[in-house]
């Protein structure tokens, strides 16, 4: 087999493996976001894109974003 062809095949395989590993890593980091009026852990917790985690006294809930 042509050595240049082997190098190209090797690079394609390596690129595919790296892309697959990155996709798995991103999936493992992703978590389900809370929805409107659902409890959340703190100001940084994940709510859906139109909401944010807001303190309502002693607890936090996902509420509609305020302002711009």
Curated annotation (Swiss-Prot):
**Record function comment:** Cell penetrating peptide (CPP) that increases intracellular calcium release through the activation of nuclear inositol 1,4,5-trisphosphate receptors (ITPR) of cardiomyocytes, thereby causing an increase in the contraction frequency of these cells. In vivo, this toxin is not lethal to mice, hovewer anti-CPP serum reduces venom lethality, suggesting that this toxin is lethal when it acts in synergy with other venom components.
GO cellular component term, pick one:
extracellular region
| Alphabetically ordered keywords of this record | Calcium channel impairing toxin, Cardiotoxin, Disulfide bond, Ion channel impairing toxin, Knottin, Nucleus, Secreted, Signal, Toxin
**Which cysteine pairs make disulfide bonds?**
33-47, 40-53, 46-62
What's the family?
Belongs to the scorpion calcin-like family.
A single GO molecular-function term is:
toxin activity
Q: Where in the cell is it found?
A: Secreted; Nucleus
Q: How is it used?
A: The peptide(14-39) may have biotechnological applications as a drug delivery system targeting cancer cells, since it lacks pharmacological activity of the wild-type toxin and has selective internalization properties in specific cell lines. It is directed to the nucleus of six neoplastic cell lines (SK-MEL-188, HEP G2, Caco-2, MDA-MB-231, A549 and DU 145), as well as in rat cardiomyocytes, and rat heptocytes. However, it is unable to cross the cell membrane of six normal immortalized cell lines (HUV-EC-C, HFF-1, MCR-5, HEK-293, BHK-21 and MDCK).
Regarding domains, what does the record say? Answer: The presence of a 'disulfide through disulfide knot' structurally defines this protein as a knottin.
The signal sequence is: 1-23
Hey, what tissues is this thing expressed in? Expressed by the venom gland. In intravenously injected mice, the labeled toxin has preference for heart, liver and lungs.
Q: What is this protein called?
A: Intracellular calcium channel modulator CCP-Ts
Q: What is the lineage of its organism?
A: Eukaryota, Metazoa, Ecdysozoa, Arthropoda, Chelicerata
């Amino acid at each position: 087999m042509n050595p240049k062809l082997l190098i190209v095949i090797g690079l394609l395989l390596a690129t595919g493996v790296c892309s697959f590993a990155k996709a798995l890593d991103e999936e493992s980091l992703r978590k389900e976001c809370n929805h409107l009026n659902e409890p959340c852990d703190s100001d940084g917790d994940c709510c859906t894109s139109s909401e944010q985690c807001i303190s309502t006294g002693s607890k936090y809930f996902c509420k509609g974003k305020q302002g711009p």
